[in-house]
């Protein structure tokens, strides 16, 4: 089983997460940030991941700490669930539309952390989520999963753009974690 159970408790947040890479897309997510919950639910569904997240935090301040720490824990869970990465495809990509929005995501689970993100948002918020935190979410996730991630999105509706990004990320990850045989896909012999 390729799964992980991670807990992170700080003075700012308390997060419990369970992740199953070879799941069915079921999820139970409660961060207290409705739009963020919607994005994570969509991520689980389209990534065919089973994902449980119970997260609380200092939302009275703002949503920054909770979104950042959720991304940290998700990155750690991905890394733990992948183990030594034996047999995984390693690379994944997806191009996903949502109405006028079009998201492109390409990733490499080879252990080199890097994020390139080309996305502009017009509105300061979508629901209860600050749009600046979309980039911060993916930065924190890549740092903690040791993933190289390239993201680009076009469109004019920020909800559609963000949702297309999360769906494209889910499909790209789904392809990258797929078992394609045996062995490590690296000339170094390790990922």
Curated annotation (Swiss-Prot):
InterPro entries: IGPD_sf, ImidazoleglycerolP_deHydtase, ImidazoleglycerP_deHydtase_CS, Ribosomal_Su5_D2-typ_SF. Its main location: cytoplasm. Pathway: Amino-acid biosynthesis; L-histidine biosynthesis; L-histidine from 5-phospho-alpha-D-ribose 1-diphosphate: step 6/9. Transmembrane segments: none annotated. It is found in: Cytoplasm. It is an enzyme of class 4 (lyase). GO terms for biological process: L-histidine biosynthetic process. Keywords: Amino-acid biosynthesis, Cytoplasm, Histidine biosynthesis, Lyase. PANTHER family: IMIDAZOLEGLYCEROL-PHOSPHATE DEHYDRATASE, IMIDAZOLEGLYCEROL-PHOSPHATE DEHYDRATASE HIS7. This is Imidazoleglycerol-phosphate dehydratase. It comes from Methanococcoides burtonii (strain DSM 6242 / NBRC 107633 / OCM 468 / ACE-M). The lineage of its organism: Archaea, Methanobacteriati, Methanobacteriota, Stenosarchaea group, Methanomicrobia.
């Amino acid at each position: 089983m390729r799964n992980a159970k991670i807990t992170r408790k700080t003075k700012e947040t308390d997060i419990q997460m369970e992740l199953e890479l070879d799941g069915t897309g079921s999820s139970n997510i409660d961060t207290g940030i409705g739009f963020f919950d919607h994005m994570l639910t969509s991520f689980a569904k389209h990534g065919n991941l089973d994902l449980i997240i119970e997260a609380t935090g200092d939302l009275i301040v703002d949503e920054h700490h909770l979104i950042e720490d959720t991304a940290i824990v998700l990155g750690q869970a991905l890394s733990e669930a992948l183990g030594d990465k034996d047999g995984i495809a390693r690379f994944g990509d997806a191009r996903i539309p949502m109405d006028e929005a079009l998201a492109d995501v390409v990733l490499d689970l080879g252990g080199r952390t890097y994020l390139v993100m080309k996305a502009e948002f017009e509105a300061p918020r979508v629901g209860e989520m600050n749009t600046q935190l979309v980039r911060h979410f993916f930065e924190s996730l890549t740092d903690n999963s040791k993933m190289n991630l390239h993201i680009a999105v076009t469109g004019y509706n920020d909800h559609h753009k963000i949702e297309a990004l999360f769906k494209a990320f889910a499909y790209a990850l789904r392809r990258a974690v797929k078992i394609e045989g045996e062995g490590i896909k690296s000339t170094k012999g390790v990922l």
